[in-house]
A protein has these predicted regions:
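Catalytic cores of nucleophile-dependent amide-cleaving enzymes
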Residues: 66-70, 75-153
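Short amphipathic alpha-helices and their capping/turn segments at secondary-structure boundaries
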Residues: 50-65
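A domain-level signal for caspase-like cysteine endopeptidase catalytic cores
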Residues: 1-54
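Hydrophobic, Leu/Ile/Phe/Ala-enriched alpha-helical segments that form helix-helix packing faces
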Residues: 28-36, 55-59, 103-104, 133, ...
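Non-Sec secretion/translocation targeting segments of pathogen effectors
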Residues: 1, 67, 203-205
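Solvent-exposed, well-ordered amphipathic alpha-helical segments
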Residues: 30-38, 63-66, 112-114
Length: 205
């Protein structure tokens, strides 16, 4: 892995709405990760405009080699409160396109974008999200197909030019790959499971 910043962005708005404990777990979890030397800096975002502005401007003399996003997700999407981000951010007409491009230009050639969110890489839309983001940024994209908590299941990675190796129905408890309705909760014996205390993606995931 090349030199560069390791950053976490989390949804700080969760502290002000139920379940508040989840919001505080994200906030104080970043302190633990910093103390363990896993990340260099964390930012609590109120929306993706602020998040991307931080990613585009923080310590601009250094590249970024890893971004973890801690927040809510759905199939092919991530959220800060009600502000959603999906693969449409890659279109020049998107309101966050310029900020995203500025962030993208800071990524190292072997950068990792890890979405520690529920379901984001699940179903067909999650696979399409991972593929589009990897191809556009040149980064390795990682995320989950299950609802995550302490256990975080269905963790998969995709590199530029690759096709997803996991089933588009993985993690689904109701619906189809094209029209998902509900996902399973993560468990210790579900596929590709880590915990929230793990800071590294195992080989083969």
């Amino acid at each position: 892995m090349s030199e560069g910043l390791r950053l976490v962005v989390y949804d700080r708005t969760q502290r002000f709405r139920a379940p508040r404990a989840l919001g505080y777990s994200w906030q104080y979890g970043t302190h633990l990760y910093r103390a363990l030397g896993r990340v260099d800096r964390a930012y609590g975002a109120r929306d993706f405009g602020g998040a991307l502005r931080f990613l585009a401007t923080h310590a601009p003399e250094q590249p970024i080699r890893e971004l973890q996003f801690w927040g809510h997700g759905k199939w092919g999407k991530i959220f800060v409160d009600r502000d959603a981000l999906d693969r449409s951010v890659l279109a020049p007409s998107h309101r966050y396109y310029d900020l995203f491009r500025s962030f993208q230009q800071r990524l190292t050639p072997d950068a990792l974008l890890w979405f520690r969110t529920c379901e984001t890489l699940g179903a067909r839309s999650g696979q399409d999200f991972a593929r589009a983001l990897a191809d556009a940024t040149g980064a390795r994209v990682a995320g989950h197909t299950y609802v995550i908590g302490f256990f975080q299941s269905g963790l998969h990675c995709l590199r530029p030019g690759e096709n997803p190796s996991w089933s588009a129905t993985e993690g689904l408890s109701r619906g189809t790959a094209e029209a998902p309705e509900r996902a399973h909760w993560s468990t210790a014996d579900s596929p590709n499971t880590i915990t929230c205390l793990d800071g590294r993606i195992p080989d083969g995931f």
